[in-house]
């Protein structure tokens, strides 16, 4: 038999298999990030991978709608795979309106986007994120940013920058320049500022109807600045927004280092449901954003009919793993038990039971390898101790133990071994 052709032996394009070292690295990320969220009082949720297409498309921009994995089920219903967790969580809240607010939820789960696969961009990928629902206070914005930075710190991200913007600020600026009618065109062009050249971004705005002079001015205004500088600029544009950001600045100063933050008007995010503050993080030399989020005060009302302020963030787990250099985590076996014949098998099983109940991982040889082959095998898979039980050991009532790290060998009585639990 020839088996499967090569292309069927691989996962579908844009998806990946997780072998043990990579999966344990993923588990490490899950445990570390979950611990951060739990420490801030967030509780974990999960939703179906499959959603009604109408739910997914209700507030997503056209670019995102085009990336939804869409299909009809056998009953002819229009369904799709979730592209993030914010929309499904908004749906969940819509029929759980009696939940006490603010609601603090977090997730670590798979999402799907039918995007063009490339470096750092998969069609199936993991996201970690939080949603804080039911608060319009700037303290909520400060809390979400604090969780965001603490999550990045916890996994070892270094030299990262969190770039903040506010769609209301950009809207005020466009109003001043008389180009509010071209808001969507300008947003989409600014969103590509990190990927395209100055000329290409300006061209996108001009092709959308913005005059060349105004497009150049918008591009130049959308330069990075410190949070302190941004507060002054925002206050001149709108005193109400200025008051909000003065409070946010005060709360952030009390919780985190402001050196980690920059204000950048080109950060407008790719999803159309954000209504206020938006932000993205860039770690070291890694070119792509490892995560981001913002405020979406109108989204919950679309699903529940109830006005409910909310904000949150999502981190692309694979991107963050790549940015911090976490490629794999080896998880060596604690004990491998080798026996020379079936007479020793009951002893091997008894010892294995005791060790497993004490929390150790134990494999008992299946009887298909000789001792030389076992050595080759356990060195490849990674093993701490080899336990050998042969005829001599049975007669003496002991096991022979080889410490493969220290390269030591010693004997231990059966009775003493059982006493480990």
Curated annotation (Swiss-Prot):
Tell me the Gene Ontology biological-process terms attached to this UniProt entry: histidyl-tRNA aminoacylation; L-histidine biosynthetic process
The UniProt entry, under InterPro entries, shows: aa-tRNA-synth_II, aa-tRNA-synth_II/BPL/LPL, Anticodon-bd, Anticodon-bd_dom_sf, His-tRNA-ligase, HisRS-like_core, HisRS/HisZ, HisZ
Task: List keywords of the entry alphabetically.
Answer: Aminoacyl-tRNA synthetase, ATP-binding, Cytoplasm, Ligase, Nucleotide-binding, Protein biosynthesis
GO cellular component: a single term: cytoplasm
Which Gene3D superfamilies does UniProt cross-reference here?
Answer: Anticodon-binding domain (3.40.50.800), Bira Bifunctional Protein, Domain 2 (3.30.930.10)
Record's catalysed reaction(s): tRNA(His) + L-histidine + ATP = L-histidyl-tRNA(His) + AMP + diphosphate + H(+)
Q: What is its EC number?
A: 6.1.1.21
State any single GO MF term. ATP binding
Q: Does the keyword Cytoplasm apply?
A: yes
Keyword DNA-binding tagged: no
What EC class does the entry list? Answer: ligase
Annotated compartments? Cytoplasm
Q: Which PROSITE patterns match?
A: AA_TRNA_LIGASE_II
The record's annotation in NCBIfam families points to: hisS
Q: Which HAMAP family match?
A: His_tRNA_synth, HisZ
Give the protein family: Belongs to the class-II aminoacyl-tRNA synthetase family.
Q: What is the protein's given name?
A: Histidine--tRNA ligase
This chain's source organism reads: Pyrobaculum islandicum (strain DSM 4184 / JCM 9189 / GEO3)
The lineage, from the top, is:
Archaea, Thermoproteota, Thermoprotei, Thermoproteales, Thermoproteaceae
Gene of this entry? hisS
